Design a protein with these regions (language model features):
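Conserved alpha/beta-hydrolase catalytic His-Asp/Glu region
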Residues: 124-126, 144-202
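Conserved loop-alpha-helix segment in the C-terminal half of the alpha/beta-hydrolase fold
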Residues: 38-41, 207-242, 248
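Catalytic active-site module of serine/aspartate enzymes centered on a nucleophile-bearing elbow/loop
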Residues: 234-267
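Flexible "cap/lid" loop of the alpha/beta hydrolase fold
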Residues: 100, 104, 113-143
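Conserved HGGG/HGGXW glycine-rich cap/lid loop of the alpha/beta-hydrolase fold
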Residues: 9-60
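Gly/Ala-rich beta-loop-alpha elbow adjacent to hydrolase catalytic centers
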Residues: 91-95, 99
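Residue in the alpha/beta-hydrolase core beta-strand immediately N-terminal to the catalytic nucleophile
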Residues: 87-88, 111-114
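Active-site loop/oxyanion-hole signature of alpha/beta-hydrolase fold enzymes
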Residues: 49-90
Length: 267
């Protein structure tokens, strides 16, 4: 698979059909979306674009470390690569924040939005978050990447061999590549979009699926519920045994809900 580049953004495109754009979370990269979703055979009839956000994965940093500048970069990418075609957008956490901005900006093009644990309030001092917890499986023997196991426990609810392997596959590559200085400046200075209060203004026909974790200590779930419950086109799912790394805690449910959205969005 050949890695492509446009205007400093590294991306991978696969397949043909209606397009799905995948946006990963902060400090992560396209491994967290591509490796996860490519295991789902039901997306084979869609064209998929997995990209690295600026300063993450293989994408270059940008001069201005702000969400407004990153969004502007994504708009230029979409206008050039996707054009005026209809598309679906997926976003996790910070990628979910940007996905909402994209759905707002391209109201006549975005047919569906799938959000997992999305940021809806950039200022973490204003978020209502939850207390994290762990649900332990069988005793584990850690033989690789033991320095990251504490982060794994801090971010995942389900603690077992399967979820630990998934964490190393989906999360670790991004953590190791992320430009810490760039992201630090982004978080400190200009993490919020200037039009944050307008993010929930999607197209009237845009289908929405939001999936939240009950033990999400990063973005919580209560404010997302309050925001999206007002939308007639939105389905909201709250998972009890899940935290912020929801795709690792409950992969089967994520696949099921994602497939339901992309296959039934026109009904």
């Amino acid at each position: 698979m050949v890695l492509k580049q446009y205007n400093g953004i590294q991306y991978q495109d696969l397949g043909e059909g209606e397009l799905i754009l995948f946006l990963h979370g902060l400090f992560l990269d396209k491994n967290s979306t591509q490796i996860f979703f490519e295991k789902d055979s039901q997306i084979s009839n869609f064209k998929r674009i997995y990209l690295d956000l600026p300063g993450m994965g293989d994408s270059a940093i940008i001069e201005e470390p702000s969400s407004n500048a990153i969004f502007k970069k994504l708009v230029a990418f979409i206008d050039h690569i996707i054009g005026e075609k209809s598309f679906i957008v997926y976003g996790h956490s910070y990628g979910g924040y940007l996905a909402q901005a994209i759905a707002h900006h391209y109201q006549n093009q975005v047919s569906a939005v799938f959000l997992t644990c999305p940021v809806v309030i950039a200022d973490d001092n204003l978020r209502i978050t939850e207390k994290h917890k762990n649900e332990f499986g069988d005793e584990m023997k850690i033989t690789t990447n033991d320095a990251f196991f504490s982060d794994f426990e801090a971010m995942n609810v389900m603690i077992n061999e399967t979820s630990w392997l998934a964490y190393q596959e989906l999360i670790l590559p991004g953590l190791q590549k992320a430009n810490q200085v760039f992201i630090g400046k982004l978080q400190k200075n200009s993490y919020g979009l200037s039009f944050e209060k307008e993010l929930d203004h999607f197209g009237s026909e845009t289908k929405i699926q939001v999936v939240l974790g009950r033990y999400d200590h990063v973005v919580g779930y209560k404010q997302q519920l309050a925001l999206f419950v007002q939308k007639e086109n939105a389905d909201i799912t709250l998972l009890s045994s899940a935290g912020h790394n929801i795709m690792i805690d409950q992969p089967g449910t994520i696949y099921s809900l994602f497939n339901k959205l992309i296959n039934n969005k026109n009904q």
